[in-house]
Amino acid sequence: MTHWLCFTLALVAVRGVLSEIQLVESGGAIRKPGDSLRLSCKASGFTFSDTWMAWARQPPGKGLQWVGEINGNSETIRYAPEVKGRLTISRDNTQNLLFLQISSLKPEDTATYYCAR
């Protein structure tokens, strides 16, 4: 029996006082266990390169789980213990993009994924 994993992304938009802060995620898909997946988050409305960015996820019927975070110059990256070694967080400050690469997908990776600042 083949199991399928579902990855969804949420659009997060926060209105700022002088500008609109937006985080727009993409890359969600249905994958099989063992596959890999790359999620992206396009940021605007703030100085991306100066900002710590994070990924979180919410499995169906469960609470929000912190996945990891990365500082502005990518020198410091932290991961939740349960995902360390299978997830890679990176960023491209020239394009204001945040990435989450997930390898060796497991059923417990099924969740809605969020990027945050």
UniProtKB/Swiss-Prot annotation:
GO CC terms in record: extracellular region; immunoglobulin complex
Framework-1 as annotated region, ranges: 20-49
* SUPFAM superfamilies assigned: Immunoglobulin
Concerning PROSITE patterns, the annotation shows:
IG_LIKE
Q: Where is this region: Framework-3?
A: 86-117
According to its UniProt entry, one GO biological process term is: adaptive immune response
Ranges where the record places region Framework-2: 55-68
Region named Complementarity-determining-2: 69-85
- Please list where the region (Complementarity-determining-1) is annotated: 50-54
Keywords on this record?
A: Adaptive immunity, Disulfide bond, Immunity, Immunoglobulin, Signal
Listed Pfam families = V-set
Q: Which residues form the signal peptide?
A: 1-19
Keyword Signal appears in the UniProt entry: yes
Q: What is this protein called?
A: Ig heavy chain V region G4
